[in-house]
Amino acid sequence: MLSRAFMDAVEPLYNPGLGTEHVAGLLYSIVRMTRPRSLLEIGLGYTTPFLLQAMRDNIEEHAEDLRRLQRGEPDDPRLEVLRVEAYKRDYAPTVLAVDDLSDSDTTATEVPRVIAALGLDHLYTLHQGSFRRLTPTLVPPVVPFDFVWFDCGGPREYVDFLTEYWPHIQPHGGILLLHYTYWHMPTVRNRRAGSPLTPGPLEPSLMLREIKRQQGRLGLDARFEVASLVEPHKTRQGSVTLIRRLAETPPNGDCDMAAELEAGGFPGPYARFTL
C-alpha cells in the first residue's frame, strides 16, 4: 500500500513541471487491479517506485489469496470473488525499466537510490541505455509485456517506440499507457480562434493509425480499446492515453443489451433503458 513513509521517501523524485503527481497513483491502481506478470517502463522518474510498490503488493496479495484458497474456509468472503485458474501458476512478475539517464531535467538518476531505500530494488532490472533496438535481446518471461508505461521524449520517440514494441505487447488484453498526448493552449486556425484542446506531442488518433499501419504491413489485425484522460486545469503534461490490446473484437449485435444478456444465458428480466 502507499503508506506515509512511502510517500515521504518518493517526494524528492517529484518534479512539478513533469505532471505525474496524479499519474503515479493511477499507475499504482491499474497495476494492482490488472496484476501483470511482465511490466515495462520506459523513462524513469517519480512513477517508478509506484509501479514497483504495486508489484510488491501484488506478490503479497497473490500469496495471501493462495493461502486462503488452500485453507478453503467456507465462510471466507474473499473466496467468492477469486478465479481459481489464476492461482495455478506461480506469480513471479518481471519488471524492466529503461532509461539512458541523460536528461538533466528529470529525476531519473535519483530513482535507483530511492528504490533501494524502499527495499524495492530486487523487483526490477534497469537497462541503462536507449529503448531502441532492445527487443531482439528480450525473451520470455520478460516478453510479451502485460503492462507498458511509456513516458520518454517527443513525437519521434513515440513513433519509434510503437514501431518496435507494439508486436511485443500481450495481444490478449495487454495494456499500454502513454503520457502527455494532449495539451491545452490557444490555437489559431485560418486566422480564427480554434479549439483550446489541441493535440500534444502525438495525438492519440495518429498513434492508432500508426499501430494499424504496422499491423497491416505484417498481415495482422490491430484490435484495441482506447481511453484518454485529460487534466482540464493544465496547459501541458496533463494527459494519459490508455490502449488495451484485444485478440478478438466481439461482433456488434443487432439487439439491445438486455436481449444480448438473455441470449447469453444470463437470467432476466433486465431493466430497459434509453439514451
Q: At which residue positions do the language-model features occur?
A:
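S-adenosylmethionine/decaboxylated-SAM
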Residues: M33, R37-L275
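Class I SAM-dependent methyltransferase Rossmann-like catalytic core
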Residues: L2-R35, P49-Q53
